[in-house]
Amino acid sequence: MSKQTYKVCFCFRRRFRYTASEAPREIKTIFEKYSENGVMTVDHLHRFLIDVQKQDKATREDAQSIINSASSLLHRNGLHLDAFFKYLFGDNNPPLALHKVHHDMDAPISHYFIFTGHNSYLTGNQLSSDCSEVPIIDALKKGVRVIELDIWPNSNKDDIDVLHGMTLTTPVGLIKCLKAIRAHAFDVSDYPVVVTLEDHLTPDLQSKVAEMVTEIFGEILFTPPVGESLKEFPSPNSLKRRIIISTKPPKEYKEGKDVEVVQKGKDLGDEEVWGREVPSFIQRNKSEAKDDLDGNDDDDDDDDEDKSKINAPPQYKHLIAIHAGKPKGGITECLKVDPDKVRRLSLSEEQLEKAAEKYAKQIVRFTQHNLLRIYPKGTRVTSSNYNPLVGWSHGAQMVAFNMQGYGRSLWLMQGMFRANGGCGYIKKPDLLLKSGSDSDIFDPKATLPVKTTLRVTVYMGEGWYFDFRHTHFDQYSPPDFYTRVGIAGVPGDTVMKKTKTLEDNWIPAWDEVFEFPLTVPELALLRLEVHEYDMSEKDDFGGQTCLPVWELSEGIRAFPLHSRKGEKYKSVKLLVKVEFV
């Protein structure tokens, strides 16, 4: 037990006692049930792992290992209550079932959600920040598997720069970016890295790109047989430790004109310290939609492929393994499936939402064989993001995000790709891959029956006392914490709830139960956020986590919390019970 002193006005001080965390009432009850004379033996713990933690394959050896790690040398015969509580709240009791790759990785890459970056070279906003290889390295170290580079002639027209065209961003040399990708592509995952090029080059500079890419990537570069188009994408397993180039077939060079940094529409930057709430894709802002139906990403602009190939250097064309491009015509032409050729299509977030109003099932069918990339609308000049569930629920594999930003949308992205060992590839659920007649194709907006109900008990939290100054949340008293608990998923499953606020407590014990009926648990993410209530100002941020529901471990688990930027706190955790009922 320790004491904290807070100043009140100039003359007075308030003193509060800080006490060590204590096991919640239900934990004590469980311990009594699975112990004898105050000791939980190996057999008791083994039964607890099977009955409560739902670890059907747990062995007595697993139980003994837990006792060895959680007990002192003097108490290796079993766990006392404090040691049992320490184990439950410890790092060896995580919320995700598996921390290794466990999905089937032998299907075509069109069958996977892929961790995708947007304008991966930018250090900040979309209009005036620096371009650098550092954000690319950071993204790769976080498990991102798709890196986007906008390539332009340099000022002398004799080399290639990477920058956000028609803005005031300062360029970085392409060769630096390529070397960074080569050096760090497989730091955290062996699965393939896709480099998408937004090409604004002359044919002679395209030849130079081909030389750079071939020299730097060497034998790890994946290229299809000369003169052949892919009829089906290879699998992640077959492409392990390979780099893939994706862009549209080269077209005639058009030199950029004057800088144009003004975008129409409202900047959709984060509205609060921790980020605006994630919008539902059934509550679309029509006025914003009108401003950016065409987006500002010309990666897949309509192109006359026959004309473009006249001057395109063959060595550059040969680099392109994943062809991108929008066929001439409307969205129905874009979504046509060619049985003899697969390709990548890019749509802005607004284009996707507009298309999904009438063509949701066609989009899902398209993504069963082809790749669909979604990118942020042009008015997101502060590098904010959007609701990724819109793309995922329609089967889009590459939902491109500004990784240098932060906010609730990015938390969903980070949470999604904690699945499958954090390798950057997540097998799409079967419902998105089911083919046949239109009645068999998944409709993201359909009202479906409840498949399961997720019950979440938020017992308590701790760790803020160690990771923050004692006046970080409040100058005059300990913090007043509450937790927001909810689901991000298809519209019918999406909801947020909250606990009561507990005043003046560094170790809040809410002990509240929430139930979430889920119609599509395969696309549901559990959201947990802690905030500190402030009567006069905006509530303070106290940590967050987001996790894929389908990979949650049942039972009582320690949920580590993360900062606004997604960095895990050293000590802050929530003790939560997860049940499917």
From Swiss-Prot:
Domain PI-PLC X-box: 103-248
Induction (UniProt): Not induced by environmental stresses such as dehydration, salinity and low temperature.
Chain positions covered by the region annotation Disordered: 279-314
Top-tier EC class: hydrolase
GO molecular function, one term: phosphatidylinositol-4,5-bisphosphate phospholipase C activity
Cellular component GO terms held in the UniProt record: plasma membrane
Main location: membrane
Membrane topology: Peripheral membrane protein
EC number: 3.1.4.11
A biological process term (GO) from this entry: lipid catabolic process
Boundaries of every PI-PLC Y-box domain copy: 317-433
Ranges of residues in domain EF-hand-like: 26-102
Record's catalysed reaction(s): a 1,2-diacyl-sn-glycero-3-phospho-(1D-myo-inositol-4,5-bisphosphate) + H2O = 1D-myo-inositol 1,4,5-trisphosphate + a 1,2-diacyl-sn-glycerol + H(+)
Tissue expr: Expressed in roots, shoots, leaves and flowers.
Catalytic site: H118, H164
Subcellular location: Cell membrane
PTM text: Phosphorylation level varies significantly during early response to bacterial elicitor.
Protein keywords: Cell membrane, Hydrolase, Lipid degradation, Lipid metabolism, Membrane, Phosphoprotein, Transducer
Superkingdom of source: Eukaryota
InterPro entries assigned to the protein according to its UniProt record, in alphabetical order: C2_dom, C2_domain_sf, EF-hand-dom_pair, PI-PLC_fam, PLC-like_Pdiesterase_TIM-brl, PLC_EF-hand-like, PLipase_C_PInositol-sp_X_dom, PLipase_C_Pinositol-sp_Y
Domain remarks in the Swiss-Prot or TrEMBL record: Amino acids 23-36 of the EF-hand-like domain are necessary catalysis but not for binding to lipid vesicles.
Function statement: The production of the second messenger molecules diacylglycerol (DAG) and inositol 1,4,5-trisphosphate (IP3) is mediated by activated phosphatidylinositol-specific phospholipase C enzymes. At physiological calcium concentration, the preferred substrate is phosphatidylinositol 4,5-bisphosphate versus phosphatidylinositol.
Protein name: Phosphoinositide phospholipase C 2
Gene that this polypeptide is encoded by: PLC2
